[in-house]
Swiss-Prot record:
The gene is mbtM. This is Medium/long-chain-fatty-acid--[acyl-carrier-protein] ligase MbtM. It comes from Mycolicibacterium paratuberculosis (strain ATCC BAA-968 / K-10). Keywords: ATP-binding, Ligase, Nucleotide-binding. The keyword Nucleotide-binding applies. Pfam families: AMP-binding. Pathway: Siderophore biosynthesis; mycobactin biosynthesis. It catalyses: a long-chain fatty acid + holo-[ACP] + ATP = a long-chain fatty acyl-[ACP] + AMP + diphosphate; a medium-chain fatty acid + holo-[ACP] + ATP = a medium-chain fatty acyl-[ACP] + AMP + diphosphate.
Length: 521
């Protein structure tokens, strides 16, 4: 048994806390003791060992008691885990199922567990599914009533096969060892000061590194976790606040867009008490300082402590968390100035224990800014199908940033940097300004440089638009960007809501946007 499996076993068997799962059909919370979850995990492990212990178990579906148990059960059996998302709204079921099983087969997964409509769609592919692919009912595998036999000998399988974002390129699969996963969970819990008295609340998808880490850190820390499916949040985002209030959650996490949404429409909020929250992690995408500050201010009348605001930095290649401020720090800013003015960036704290960060100078980055490089115990062994990495070497993240007196500051992606008239501009600065125009959808704007190696480089802004006056909005976007950012867009292209391509975790696929625009030209 790996140290990761042993640590989770010790925490789950002895803990007095609960896993509380939201059931969408009844709109009710179902409470389960962690020892009960571990008992089902043992059943999953026995089921897998009966089948010669596959190298990795594939999981698909919304979070249930059995789904959570299957993650731990795979590790009890010495197997790895890969979790893939269900179909997005409007997807054709058979095509989604075929793509999902093909993705699993491509990373060596031959055993898949699922439930509900996801299971039906995956099993309907038989006999056209990939060779030797087995798709079974998750509930049947979990409820065998059996205990895991004597722990198998340790082996070299990764604990997690985690897809990377792929927002600026082709997605890859990070192979994470049990030791790396455990180091990251311990480092995160140490930074946050997690105790069994804490209560977590999350609707983050478990196929995303932040959602999976939140779940595992809760189990390892012995705290209760209220876990809702992402679809329940999407259907009614303000439920999140009601869940936080009902659970008396002390820790939660969400991507930036969720905080922006709640802050923007705070007038809809009533009857909630957020006074128990001591940590509200903002991660998974760039932090909009104004939007996060608006959230903290708007939620103050409901008991939210501004010190709970926790903007953080992480990536799948490091399991998840890289830098996180200490609880109580709150939202702090660092200014970046040039000839066009000063822009604020969120300070994302210090490296978690076991992780190191350095800034490597780059000739194409603005003065004082370099590429963020990391190393430490949480690092992946490498990308699946690629050469392994040396954990003693520094890993280039592709992100640009610097250290302020208060911690790490991330300015943007190196690949996304736009060069115009001798200036280097981060697209997030332009996108934030453009999103302030009425009708432009927040979090649905992409700024791209064009012809940067030609005599006439330009700037194109593509945005989802839900207003009526396109011409007026287009003119206002150009005027605002020119005034605030000091560059004049060559073109502003409005698109229908939901049409910009995104990754499975909701990040905009900038490379795909660029390709689409180039194809139109």
């Amino acid at each position: 048994m790996s140290e990761l499996a042993a640590a989770l076993t010790a925490a789950m068997r002895t803990g007095g806390s609960d896993l509380v799962v939201f059931d969408r059909e009844s709109a009710a919370w179902r409470r389960h003791r962690w020892p009960e979850v571990h008992g089902l995990a043992e059943g999953i492990a026995a089921w897998l060992l009966d089948r010669d212990r596959p190298a990795a178990l594939g999981l698909v579906g919304e979070p249930t008691l059995e789904f959570v148990a299957a993650i731990v059960g795979a590790w009890l059996a010495g197997a790895g885990v890969s979790i893939l998302p269900g179909p997005v709204r409007g997807a054709e079921g058979r095509r989604w199922a075929d793509t999902t099983l093909t993705r699993f087969a491509g990373i060596g997964v031959r055993t898949v567990l699922s439930h509900g409509s996801h299971l039906d769609a995956l099993q309907a592919l038989d006999p056209s599914r990939p060779d030797e692919m087995v798709v079974e009912d998750l509930a049947v595998a979990a409820n065998t009533g059996r205990r895991c036999p004597e722990p198998p000998a340790p082996h070299a399988n990764p604990a997690i096969l985690q897809g990377t974002a792929g927002s600026t390129g082709t997605p890859k699969t990070a192979a994470l060892s049990p030791d790396a996963v455990l180091a990251n969970l311990r480092g995160l819990n140490a930074r946050l000061g997690v105790t069994p008295a804490d209560v977590g609340c999350s609707w983050l998808p478990l196929y995303h590194d932040m959602g999976l880490s939140f779940l595992l850190a809760s189990a390892l820390g012995g705290m209760s976790l209220w876990l809702a499916p992402t679809s329940a949040f999407t259907a009614s985002p303000f439920r999140w606040l009601a869940w936080l209030s009902e659970s008396r959650a002390t820790i939660t996490a969400a991507p930036n867009f969720a905080y922006n949404l709640v802050g923007k429409y705070a007038r809809r909020v009533s009857g909630v008490d957020l006074g128990a929250l001591r940590v509200a992690i903002n991660g998974g995408e760039p932090v909009d300082c104004a939007g996060f500050e608006r959230f903290t201010t708007a939620m103050a009348p409901f008991g939210f402590d501004a010190g709970a605001a926790t903007p953080s930095y992480g990536l799948a290649e490091a399991t998840c968390a890289v830098s996180v401020p200490a609880p109580g720090t709150g939202l702090r800013f660092a200014d970046v100035s040039d000839e066009t003015g000063t822009r604020r960036h969120a300070v994302l704290g210090a490296p978690i224990p076991g992780t190191e960060i350095r800034i490597s100078p780059r000739h194409d980055a603005p003065d004082g800014i370099g590429e963020i490089e990391i190393r430490g115990a949480s690092m992946m062994d490498g990308y699946l199908g690629h050469a392994p990495i040396d954990h003693q070497n520094w890993f280039p993240t592709g992100d640009l940033g610097f250290f302020s007196d208060d911690g790490l500051v991330v300015c943007g992606r190196a690949k996304e940097l736009i060069t115009l008239a001798g200036r280097n501009i981060f697209p997030t600065e332009i996108e934030t300004v453009a999103a302030q125009v009425p009708g432009v959808r927040e979090g649905a704007v992409v700024a791209l440089g064009t012809g940067e190696n030609s005599a006439r480089p330009g700037l194109i802004i593509a945005a989802e638009f839900a207003g009526r006056d396109r011409a007026g909005a287009r003119a206002e976007v150009i005027q605002r960007v020119a005034s605030v950012c000091g560059v004049v867009p060559s073109d502003v292209i409005f698109m229908a809501p939901g049409s910009l391509p995104r990754t499975s975790s909701g990040k905009l696929r900038r490379l795909d946007v660029r390709r689409s625009l180039e194809a139109v030209d």
